[in-house]
Amino acid sequence: MQLVIAEKPSVGIALAKALGVTEKKDGYIEGNGYIVSWCVGHLVSLANADMYDEKFKKWNIADLPIIPDEWQFIIAEDKDKQFGILRQLMDDNRVTEVVNACDAGREGELIFRLVYNKALCNKPIKRLWISSMEEKAIRDGFDNLKDGKDYENLYQSALCRAKADWIVGINATRLFSKLYNRTLNVGRVQTPTLAMLYERENSISNFPKEKYFNVHLKSVGLDAVHEKVKEQGEAENIRRDCDGNEAIVKSVKTERKTVNPPHLYDLTTLQREANRLYGFTAQQTLDYTQSLYEMKLVTYPRTDSQYITDDMSDTAKNIAESVAGKLPHFSSVVIAPETKRVINNKKVSDHHAIIPTSEVSSTDLSSVPDGERKILYLIANRLLCATNEPYIYETVTAEISCSGYSFVAKGRNVISEGWKAIEKAFIDFQKCKDYTEEEEETLSLTEGQVIERPVSEVSEHFTQPPKHFTEDTLLSAMERAGTDEITEEVERSGLGTPATRASIIEKLTKSGFIKREKKNLVVTDYGTDLISVMPDIIKSASMTADWENALSLMAQGKFTSQQFMVDIEKLVDDIITVAKETIDESKVSRNGGEVIGTCPRCGKNVVVTPKAYSCEDRNCGFVIWKNDKFFEKARKPLTKEMATNLIKYGRIAVKGLYSEKSDRNYDATVCLDDTGKYVNYKLEFAPKKKKK
């Protein structure tokens, strides 16, 4: 008899149904040669530090690093009953094999193995590895169970990831919390992610906003532009010279462009698209997709592949055709799926791309909850787009001369809509208000053509800072480990995995390090305080991505767990050494907070607090508020570096201050004007150069 252990009850029940197991017991189902039971998420986890030694209940820098010689594991307090049931079932003499039917991925392997090992079971392990919860897929999976030994490397990878998070989290959190006298939660992956968000906020805050002007030359079906004139007066002169005067088309260049269909979804690209179109968080999308998977409507969600295998070609084509017939908005679109471009056996390892299942054709989609239904439509639409023809168009660039000035007009002529027709039909059907795509107008001009009496206008613009991260763009940055470019040929590593990135974002939010402002993710004062004191060694996105890559190689048997743990332990030693070398007592206030200078009033420390830079002696009262109205009106955020220099020198040179009166930016020296009761500011300007 086989004991089948699923990751959670709902999956266990679905497996039992597919196997014809019907006799319900307390915590399991029995019959037809099987016992089907389940975990409830993580039943067993790594023990806390104080389980190794009572002294670790108190946080002391002298005790660091804390690195267990022999790792201990504990049963979750509220889950001991289910663990007891599983242990009893494993001991059952009727059971000859244990089938690991937990999630077919790294975390599912860990959940099962920790329970199996904690129960001291030594019976043979078989592995169920499926990408669909359809009953046929389940039965096929049981007909082709894998040897559990084949997944030993995956287990070691999962266990090392858990140990690394434990070691870095406990040691770094205790170290920096004690150094700065306040709780600073540090994580192996979450801290580099927070650092990326912080750097983006800094780029936005310090962006030198500059005004410029465009001069337009307009006629019927034409809007040519002379771009980025710095001075308004110069732009007005161009406008006056050109307005109503004859213009001539000097040249017309055309270029044919082909845009291939998008890839099928992996989890990350699905999360990004759902955030962009619907505003769903990464966690919401994962939850909805997991629900659809358990409803047998889509394939396995936690995948990093955007392709299917060649043996799935006919199935994918049939599903695409049935999905197209199921969704009314495709009635006016030609559907002729071609799967050749979505097949790549080399780029499918554990699981293929997320696609709908054949169950969709026989399901009443109106009964599917709204969130899940939107994700299902998104996945179905992507399958149809990915298997359609390329989008082909022609760009047109015309150079136009008027009164000695050069203007450029751009347009686009569509040759074949291809997959774009499907996407547009989908967007209209879903009424995605936030969906935007720049589309150039059709342009029809010939070289030498004369444009009579065009109208000339001036438009005002500002250079734009980088945009705040959304979950869409943050997921992309995490996938790329903070770098800007990644090619199709390079194997992707990154911060976290497709399965864990959503939880990292949620953890940063729940910990108060970041907050959501509509779709934007913004670093809080608490997050700023944490990152501002972290050494580069723990903020490095690329280094953390290297660890993730090592874990991936370990799962493939190409990197040893022993070497990984040696490297992680060295990392912790380096973090502690660097922190002790760079942060001494002069940098830490007895009352908590990083010291940035000496109070100009009383000579005591000025420390960083969530809302200000203030004297540690409350009786002194010296404080520089982070949201001071002077800097808010000037649209120039007061950074820690600016506050440090104000305190040290009494003045700072600042570029790009904003004047409400003139609606212009200017440069000036901001001087600290401390009355002894209030901190004010005054401006000094460099003397104007005399004209010779």
Regions found by a protein language model. Name each.
Residues 1-162, 166, 464-465:
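Intrinsically disordered, low-complexity regulatory segments
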Residues 1, 101-104, 181-183, 254-263, ...:
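Conserved short loop/turn motifs at secondary-structure junctions
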Residues 2-3, 79, 90, 96, ...:
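Basic, low-complexity terminal or inter-domain segments flanking catalytic cores
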Residues 9-16, 33-36, 40, 76-87, ...:
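Amphipathic alpha-helical transducer elements in NTP-driven molecular machines
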Residues 232-265, 271, 542:
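Metal- or metallocofactor-binding catalytic centers and their adjacent structured scaffolds
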Residues 93, 137-219, 254-258:
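C-terminal or mid-to-C-terminal helical accessory/interaction module adjacent to the motor/catalytic core
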Residues 71-74, 102, 122-126, 147-154, ...:
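Short, polar/flexible loop-turn hinges at active-site or ligand-entry regions and domain interfaces
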